[in-house]
Amino acid sequence: MTIRHLSETIINQIAAGEVIERPASVIKELVENAIDAGATRIEVVTAGGGKTLLRVTDNGSGIPADELALAVSRHCTSKLTDDVHDIRALGFRGEALPSIGSVSKLTLKSRPQDADSGFEVCVTGGHLDGPRPTALNRGTIVEVRDLFYATPARLKFMKTDRAEATAITDVVKRIGIAFPHIRFSLAGTDRTPFEMPATGTGAEATLERIGQVLGREFGENALAIDAERDGVRLAGFVGIPSFNRGNALHQFAYVNGRPVRDKQIFGALRGAYSDVIARDRHPVAVLFLTLDPALVDVNVHPAKADVRFRDPGLVRGLIVGAIKQALAQSGIRPATSGAEAMLQAFRAEGFGAQQSAPRPANSYSPASWRTAPPAPRSEWSPQTAHPAHRPLDLQAAPALRENGQAVLGDVAVPAADARASVAEAPVELMQKPLGVARAQIHENYIVAQTEDSLVIVDQHAAHERLVYEALKNALHARPIAGQMLLIPEIVDLPEEDAQRLAGHAETLARFGLGVEQFGPGAIAVRETPAMLGEMNVQQLIRDLADEIAEHDTADGLKAMLHHVAATMACHGSVRSGRRLKPEEMNALLRDMEATPGSGTCNHGRPTYIELKLTDIERLFGRR
């Protein structure tokens, strides 16, 4: 078969296969071009899920008439000169417009700010027509009709009009978060109109724009992030642990203003929340990374959704450290969604439906309380109510019973004891975040009162978090006890993996794992963490080698130790069904206030909810 040059149309269609996957890909490229042109208003109109019509209108700088033909030619751009590593624009490859024109009917109209009239060019299946004069306000309009008509096989892979329209909306929202000073609007026959008014610049404007996308509730449950390390700056907002979602669709990451889908960034985000939310839940976050363009490669893929950092360990450490610090400094704070859910449940059941119903035989009457027999009361004793009077009940794996308690059994963990001063005035306690304990219901929930709210605490979940944090602090305060192996276990690894693992030997030793290099391609394991008991040493070493190769950290071993501590905390905390004295309840509340992350238990569930007095008054029609 003879080797020959491909035609320009075929080349563009091949490029379109990489850049233009669906209608949303077209919108992404066109909106990014509008932003690069300095637009402050961008309007998007679609029809047929974008397969029939896509139109993007902006008020940017425009394109001169003599450059319109170049704009729809491959590898022609105004955003890049001779340094491919110094990329400061969203677009730079010069492939989007010619790729779109090769698989659709493209019309490009533009009028520069200083021009008296506009001009347009048309590209149909890769064939150029124009330029010619046209009536147009200042700015640019790009209209794409019959997408993929020139490559009908691609249409078979399109989803329904509704799904494609939703994908377009998601793309505009994702881009819009990073540019709050720009007004975005979406309209069309296949959608409900949507608009994001400009909010300005700065952190407050960004949070307001995020609220337009994620809803007002995010702002009420968000923590600000602002940290910098070695020339890399991280800013943005993350949700408190109890404000989480069932999927990762509410996670947004930007590198120098560019929306990215980078698994390393989202992996670091997951790691920062590793022990404060459940494994099947996902944090809500909007993160902005700003760094020298020379330190990141955005030219990994034509779609520019993936990036490659020169120092990935630095980026991961910055993200994990900054978020963990923000969570620790946030104090005790519940998600507003918990209280909202309770209020909605009250409103859904209501009281009106019950007013006309016949009264049950055992219902309340004014005199019934006088003749009702007293409710039976269970006997209380310090052994049943006071966790400090009993050892941790480690009903878990044998390794926990035999090794875990031996290693951490002497750790002083928070207990719901009577440390609170009985003489302390309730008024002073009511001024504290969790207030003063007023009652315990069903031997599981503590009802507390603050100056302007009612707080309900899950005593087991709350104390479980307190014990877990105490055990974690003990793990980090001193080296973990190791258990010597009678015969060292030899693990064969690739030579580079063995060298990397041996380089982390000192860190691993702090966690009770003694390793040393045994020849060019092997690791000798002489000691394992005592609290882990019997374990698959071969698998552990290989997993650690993979983690060090990818992230340059050995967090996997730390996570295993934390998991053991979490199990011990679960079995060593105040159990449900235990009656507590008022002093003990107040002591638990004070410990919660002093412990970072105590708003959620080890499994990610909330430890308490708070109902504002104003909301309670609304339930009773007082407001």
Curated annotation (Swiss-Prot):
Is-annotated flag, keyword Glycoprotein?
no
Could you say which protein family the record assigns here? Belongs to the DNA mismatch repair MutL/HexB family.
Locate the compositionally biased regions of type Polar residues.
353-368
Give the classification, highest ranks. Answer: Bacteria, Pseudomonadati, Pseudomonadota, Alphaproteobacteria, Hyphomicrobiales
Stored SUPFAM superfamilies: ATPase domain of HSP90 chaperone/DNA topoisomerase II/histidine kinase, DNA mismatch repair protein MutL, Ribosomal protein S5 domain 2-like
Q: Which PANTHER family match?
A: DNA MISMATCH REPAIR PROTEIN MLH, PMS, MUTL, DNA MISMATCH REPAIR PROTEIN MLH1
Q: What is this protein called?
A: DNA mismatch repair protein MutL
Q: Which InterPro entries match?
A: DNA_mismatch_repair_CS (IPR014762), DNA_mismatch_repair_MutL (IPR020667), DNA_mismatch_S5_2-like (IPR013507), HATPase_C_sf (IPR036890), MutL/Mlh/PMS (IPR002099), MutL/Mlh/Pms-like (IPR038973), MutL_C (IPR014790), MutL_C_dimsub (IPR042120)
